[in-house]
Amino acid sequence: MRAFKYSVMAATLPFVWADVVEAESVTAETVVQRCDLDTYAGDDNRSKLTVILRDAAGNEKKNVYRRYWKNYAREKGDVFDKMVLVTEFPLDAKGTGFMRWAYKPGSGRNVDQWLYLPSLKKIRRVSVRDPADRFLGSDLSYWDISLRLVEQDEHRLVEEKTQNGKTVYVVETRPSDKRPLYSKLVARYEKNGDWSDCNKTRIEYFDPNGVLLKVQTLSWQKVSNAWLWDVVEVNNRKTGHSSVFRVSDVAINVGLKDRLFTERALKKGIR
């Protein structure tokens, strides 16, 4: 979930006073908006994504991708962002391409996805029938990585404290879906100074019966003025399965072209 952090250029007393009032009356909605939805990830970026899947017995499966991402949130139209993953490892899957277009809330459109299989030299559409489906076979579901506006769910500020020089907020979120995948999520946010340095660092997911299902921990890296995942780990408390995502070799605002995010480019190969 990526959007923009807008810095307010203000030196007048009314704006300073507004900041003081905000500091005294932080709401759960403010925390979610400023520390999550407004997180700036660049206008586009490319990186290496390493995904390690580990079962309860300790067996591991490793996948390495080249990742290309572009933000369309500020443009006209329904598209929110586009992403392409090209497999580098394992070698027997090298060149396999995956493309995903996500749409803005309120557009009424589900994500579009395509998979290119070099062995068959064919592209096929990949539909998401169930939001509980696992993204890249990991412990993150498609629901987990989808964009949700603040007003789509109910939020409650459970705790606010200072720890290690940072302001820590704990927010409980209850999805408002008719058939929610989770009864609630409890997220920890850490703010180091102002809102431009505030990120989500832990999420607890509770199943529809209120039992803890999985825990996600997140560390972040700042590249230029953009925030991206560094290492993210998800542990399923019921199955013992876990997933680790590592993002490296990041380049921000490199001017990725729209034509990169097309079926033709996916089939031709992205270099």
Regions found by a protein language model. Name each.
Residues 270-271:
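Short, solvent-exposed mixed-charge patches
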Residues 16-23:
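Sec/Tat signal peptide C-region and signal peptidase I cleavage site
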Residues 1-8:
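Bacterial N-terminal signal peptides that target proteins for export
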